[in-house]
UniProtKB/Swiss-Prot annotation:
GO terms for molecular function: FMN binding; pyridoxamine phosphate oxidase activity. Pathway: Cofactor metabolism; pyridoxal 5'-phosphate salvage; pyridoxal 5'-phosphate from pyridoxamine 5'-phosphate: step 1/1; Cofactor metabolism; pyridoxal 5'-phosphate salvage; pyridoxal 5'-phosphate from pyridoxine 5'-phosphate: step 1/1. Homodimer. It catalyses: pyridoxamine 5'-phosphate + O2 + H2O = pyridoxal 5'-phosphate + H2O2 + NH4(+); pyridoxine 5'-phosphate + O2 = pyridoxal 5'-phosphate + H2O2. Catalyzes the oxidation of either pyridoxine 5'-phosphate (PNP) or pyridoxamine 5'-phosphate (PMP) into pyridoxal 5'-phosphate (PLP). Its EC number is 1.4.3.5. FMN binds at R65, T66, V67, L68, L69, R70, Y80, T81, K87, Q109, Q145, S146, W191, R201. This is Pyridoxine/pyridoxamine 5'-phosphate oxidase. The gene is pdxH. Substrate binds at R12, L13, S14, Y15, R70, Y127, R131, S135, R197, L198, H199. Its cofactor is FMN. It is an enzyme of class 1 (oxidoreductase). Binds 1 FMN per subunit.
Length: 218
């Protein structure tokens, strides 16, 4: 065993912040999510709306990355990206994904899984025009997203060139290859760290249109 692994094996914390019982949670998992999410916002955490998005290709190879939550209703959880990105390719082949919100200072995490669909085009357009101008420009030049590029300097040059080209444009059209996705949840898991690794885990599963609550082994 290497020294690094040996050192890591000694690193651990005891979770003491809270507890989670069936009698404390909402019957609707989205309401429970909003309660925890608003708590994270009120705690002034750094980007509590950041979430890990896990997708998988048709062959089963997983990919995970951090994206930003841009809408949350009972209908689903929204994020925006380049449709030609790896996540877009995965979702075209296998339209199921999971989100993970992790708030370490609260010793909490939430998993949300389900089917993913594209957001209506007008909603994507409306959101695109709310973005800062330079972020709109960046969406144009970062394509295909995850594609290889020779250097940072070339990326910066393309950005500056497009800035100059559209300087006189009052409004930029949304690129056709860019827009939103909505994860329509059929599964939630709420995790609260507890002492001695006896963590609280409560899951909600959607069965025949109804949410069923279960406690999971830690």
């Amino acid at each position: 065993m290497s020294d690094v692994i040996k050192d890591l094996s000694e690193l651990r914390l005891s979770y003491e912040q809270g507890e989670l019982y069936e009698t404390q949670v909402a019957s609707n998992p989205h309401e429970q999510f909003l309660g925890w999410f608003n708590h994270a916002l009120a705690a002034n955490l750094h980007e509590p709306y950041a979430m890990s998005l896990a997708t998988a290709s048709a062959s089963g190879r997983p990919h995970v990355r951090t994206v930003l939550l841009r809408g949350a209703t009972e209908a689903g959880y929204d994020f925006y990206t380049n449709y030609d990105s790896q996540k877009g390719i995965d979702l075209a082949e296998n339209p199921y994904a999971e989100l993970l919100f992790y708030w370490p200072s609260l010793e909490r995490q939430v998993r949300v899984g389900g089917h993913v669909v594209k957001i209506p085009e007008q909603e994507s357009t409306d959101y695109y025009h709310k973005r800062p101008r330079d972020s709109q420009i960046a969406a144009y030049i970062s394509t295909p997203q995850s594609g290889k590029i020779e250097s940072r300097e070339l990326l910066q040059q393309r950005f500056q060139d497009l800035q100059q080209q559209v300087q006189s444009h009052e409004v930029l059209d949304k690129p056709e290859f860019w827009g939103g996705y909505r994860l329509q949840p059929d599964y939630y898991e709420f995790w609260q760290g507890r002492p001695n690794r006896l963590h609280d885990r409560l899951s909600y599963e959607k069965i025949d249109g109804q949410w069923t609550l279960h406690r999971l082994m830690p």
